[in-house]
Amino acid sequence: MSIPFGVDLGNNNTVIACAKNRGIDIVVNEVSNRSTPSLVGFGHKSRYLGESAKNQQTSNIKNTVDNLKRIVGLPHDHPDFEIEKKFFTIPLIKNEVDGGVSGKVKYLTKNHEFTATQLLAMYLDKIKDTALKETKGNISDICLSVPGWYTEKQRRAAADACKIAGLNPVRIVNEVTAAAVGYGVFKAGELPEDEYKKVAFVDVGHSSYQVSIAAVKKGELKILGSAYDKHFGGRNFDFAIAEHFAKEFKSKYKIDVHENPKAFYRVLVAAEKLKKVLSANTQAPFNIESVMNDVDVSSSLTREELEELVQPLLDRINVPIETALKDAGITVDELDSIEVIGGSSRIPAVKTRISEIFGKPLSFTLNQDEAIAKGNAYICACHSPTVRVRPFKFEDYNQYTVSYFWDKEDEEDDHLEVFPKGGLFPSTKIITLFRKGPSFEIEAKYTKPEELPKGTELHIAKWKISGVVPNEGESSIATKIKLRNDPSGFYTIESAHTVEEQIVKELIEPAEGEEVDEDAEPQYREVKKLVKKNDLTIECESAALPDAELQAFIEKEASMVMEDKLVFDTEERKNQLEEYIYELRGKLDEEYKDFASDQEKEKLSGLLMKAEDWLYEDGEDSTKAKYIAKYEELASIGNVIKGRYLAKEQEKKEQYRQKQEAAQAAAMAEKMAAQREASKKQESSSSGKNNKDTEGDVDMD
C-alpha cells in the first residue's frame, strides 16, 4: 500500500509531507533541503529536475522552465497568458492537444515541444522519486494542492499531470483550505467543541495572494468565504526591484539587461536576495559582477525606497480581504484569529498592511512554508486504508456558479443552477427529467462570467446519457440524474437511471391519540411511488485528457525517466572508472608495491595510462557498457594485487589479534595467580592468629 503524502506545489519551491510514524513529517530532498525548487530543465543528455535544474539555471536559462503552476491548464488565448509570458525564459506556443500552452526547448540536441501538463508531470515524477528515496516505501497516492482560483480545466490538468507521473491523485485541494485543515487537526486541543471559531487564513505566496474565512471547531471545518489576487506575490516584488535597477543601469552603465535573458535573470535573482535582506535590515547593497558585456554593476536600496517602488502592489492588499469577509457574511470584529502563511508574508510592508486592514494583531502559529503540505498529507491519510487518523470533517467554498443545461422537452425548463458560488462542497444534487429517449445530452457551464477570471471559457463538460426506453404506451419516462461537485472540485454526473411509477400498498398508521382496536384488520391505502428501473450509460467529454493521449504522455514520460536513469548510471560508471584509475596509480608504488611482480606493475601501469588517456579523449562521452568494460579490464589485474594486499593486511590483523589475546590471557593468568597467593597469605595469617590465642588461654577452674 502507498504511504500517504501531500504536495504543496509552490510556484518557486515545493514542499512534500508524508504520514508515517503516527505523525506528519516533512520529506527532505537529496541535498537535505525541506523544499525543492519547482523547476524543469533540459540538456543535451538528460533532464534536470528540482535542485539540479536550479544549479544549471543560469547557464541553461533558455531551456529551464519555472512558473509551472501558472500555465498548467491555461488556454493559450487566455488574457492571463500575456501577463505570464514576461516571467518565462523559454518560448511558449499554442499546443495542438487542447489549445493550451506548450514550451519549446532543446533536449537531447533536438528541438522539442512539451505541453504544460507534461512539464508539470516531469516535476511531479521527480517529487515522487524524492519521497520514494526518503521514505523507502511505496509512493502512489497523493493529495495535491492548487490555488483556489483554479477553474475546472486547470484542476483537471493538474490531476492529469499526477497520472502521467504515475501518481494517483486521491484529492485535489485548495491551498488555503489545506492549511486550514492542518490548523483544525493539529490545534484540536485548543478549539471549542460546541461553537465555531472564526479564523481568517491569509496566504501570500510567490505568485498569488489568497484569503479564506473559515469556521472551525473540534473535528470540523467550513470555508465561509474565499477571495484572491492571482497576480500578486513575491515574484511581482522581485520584478519591480529588477525593473528599477534595469532602468538605473541603463542610465549609469549604458547597458540594457532586457536584451540578454541571462543578464536579466541574474538581476532578478539578486533582486530576490535584496528583498529578503531588506526584510531584516533597513538598507542593502545590490552588486553583480560581469552582468553583461563584462560590466560590473553596483547600487543599493533602502527599505523605504522599496516600499515606494511596490506601493501599487501594497494598495491591492485590501481587496481580497474585504471580498472574502463580504462573501463569508461576517465582519472583522467577529474574527477570533488571523493566521498568516506564505513566504512573501515575511515582507515587513506586507505584514504591516495586512495588520492595519484587519485592525488586529496577526498570528504566525502555523509554519509559513510547510502548513499546506502537512494539511495535504493529513487529507491523503484520510483516504488511506492503512493509516488511522483523527476524524475531521471539512467542506470547501465553491468559487464559481455552475449550472447544468439540457435539451428542452415539453414544458420543462432547459437548465438549472445547481452549484452556486458560496455553496459548500463536496455536494450532491439529484434532478428528475422526463426524457423520450433513446439518449440525451447534459452540459455543465459557468453561468456568471463576472465571478470568473476574465477570458475564462464557460463550458465545463458534456455528458451523453443513453439507454432511455419509455414504458409501453408512454411517450417519456422519468430519469433521475445524480449531479456532483466532488471532493476535488470536479463537476460530474455520478449516475443516471430511469424510474417508473408503481402502485404500492402502504399501511395506514392510526392518528396520534386515537384508540386502537388490537383485533381489527390492518388498513392499507394505495399510493404511487417512483421505483428504479434501469441504469443508464454515461459518456463524458471533460477537460481531462482523452485516454489515448494520456497513455501516450505516460509512455513518453516513462521513456524519458529511463533515459535520465541511463545517463545517471553512465555517469556513475564513468566516475567509478576514474576513481579506480587514481586509486591504483597512487597505491601501486606504495601500499601495493610488495604485492605485484615487476611484470604485473609494468602491464598495469600501461593499462592505467591508456585508460586515462581514453577517458579524457575518446571516452569523455562514451557508453555505460564501455565504462564497465574498461573498469573490468583494469580490475582483472588490479583486484588480484589488491586482494594480496588485503590478505596480508588481514593476516597482520589476525596476528595482532592473537598477540593481543595472548597478552590478555597472560595478564589474566598473572592476575589470578596473584589473587591465589594473596588468598593463601590471608589464610595462613588467620590460622597463626587462632593458634596463638589458644596457647595463651588459662583455665581458671
Curated annotation (Swiss-Prot):
Residues 651-701 are annotated as: Disordered. It comes from the Eukaryota. Residues 661-672 have a biased composition (Low complexity). Interacts with CGR1. Has antigenic properties. Elicits a specific immune response in systemic candidiasis human patients undergoing malignant hematological disorders. PANTHER family: HSC70CB, ISOFORM G, HSC70CB, ISOFORM G-RELATED. This is Heat shock protein homolog SSE1.
